[in-house]
């Protein structure tokens, strides 16, 4: 029998429902695993282990509640999501001592469903990064190889799930920040459609791009978490009131992929794609064909502009969103200021890291008088063309598949002196955020050169997460799940 910490969320929830496992035992198993692995992995920031144990004991005393689908299940939450009474730093010195008085909507829904919050996960500062090396507090290590990065910016979430520290984690995806670390750590990572999950209580980076999604050990786990956190919230004006599909029912809708048309974009299989990623993803597509799917060649011609468009839009929105952190009402306040302007300048210079400062300055530049039309307005126009490419492609196919990342996890420090190259590695994920569509990263093997996990990205139509999950579930059953990393 597998160790408790190595089970899936689905297996754990079933054991809790059957009474063969108590909430305290589930929480204790994860705490023990945290104590065993966290000194090496560094996935977590604030922890609440004693509080979680107390909550679990109270739940056991009250008895199992069938109305709560995640009753007693220990989870972690990315440190960009507000948690009442628990520090929410966004991985930044400027918010080092900030403790919110409210929960983000997604966190509230986890709690209402019976989940037990164990910890906040490490992240690139304000979600600006692809390696979780840009946190102000620690560098997170990939559980499959501690010399390598876990991806980012939700690297702490992916590492905590891969290491068995929890059964699921909430991350955020602005340009691939759930899907890429999930790929690097051998997890399932789901970015829902923009507006499917409330962003209330999420500290914004790119308001038109950000979306909250789960990192889990199986597709069914992702479906269970999404079913809990999805749905309308009047506090977020961008949150859709469209009815939420029955994601668990969708998993049982297919036994194979007969009749499914999979679009394969030429632009996702060209220069820059590593041989080991190419091999794993093509083998996964071959298995999809064996299951009855038809591969359709498609084109997403404007994806070649996606990097430029994304970084113009994201940095402009970051410049605006992060203007609120000035040392006046909350966050870091400089002790070296003789005037109010100096307070603003010094507080932000001391509180923000280099990468955040770089993006704020670039964002301010593209929004400035004389450059707005040349950069931001043009980027917005091309963004629309990117969405139109997807709409046209989906006339020929039901889902689109390609690599989640052109490479596997790189070694720590390999990209630190070359931020541009790191930006370019987002090429396969950012178009989806610009279009606001859903995507899922599914583990499909291990690279022959690096020995690291590889993820296949499955992209879908707006609000059609049910199809993504059903397709991924069938593929997962054929390929097999990636187990917990042994550290």
Curated annotation (Swiss-Prot):
Whichever gene encodes this chain, its name is gatA
Question: Which Gene3D superfamilies does the protein's record reference?
Answer: Amidase signature (AS) domain (3.90.1300.10)
* Known partners and oligomeric status: Heterotrimer of A, B and C subunits.
Q: What's this protein's name?
A: Glutamyl-tRNA(Gln) amidotransferase subunit A
The UniProt catalytic activity note for this protein reads: L-glutamyl-tRNA(Gln) + L-glutamine + ATP + H2O = L-glutaminyl-tRNA(Gln) + L-glutamate + ADP + phosphate + H(+)
- State the function annotated in the UniProt record: Allows the formation of correctly charged Gln-tRNA(Gln) through the transamidation of misacylated Glu-tRNA(Gln) in organisms which lack glutaminyl-tRNA synthetase. The reaction takes place in the presence of glutamine and ATP through an activated gamma-phospho-Glu-tRNA(Gln).
Q: What is its EC number?
A: 6.3.5.7
Name the InterPro entries on file: Amidase, Amidase_CS, Amidase_dom, AS_sf, GatA
Q: Name one GO molecular function term.
A: ATP binding
| Alphabetically ordered keywords of this record | ATP-binding, Ligase, Nucleotide-binding, Protein biosynthesis
Q: Which Pfam families match?
A: Amidase
Family, similarity comment: Belongs to the amidase family. GatA subfamily.
Gene Ontology annotations for the cellular component aspect, listed alphabetically: glutamyl-tRNA(Gln) amidotransferase complex
Tell me the active site: 78 (charge relay system), 153 (charge relay system), 177 (acyl-ester intermediate)
**Which GO terms fall under biological process for this protein?**
translation
Organism in which the protein naturally occurs:
Oleidesulfovibrio alaskensis (strain ATCC BAA-1058 / DSM 17464 / G20)
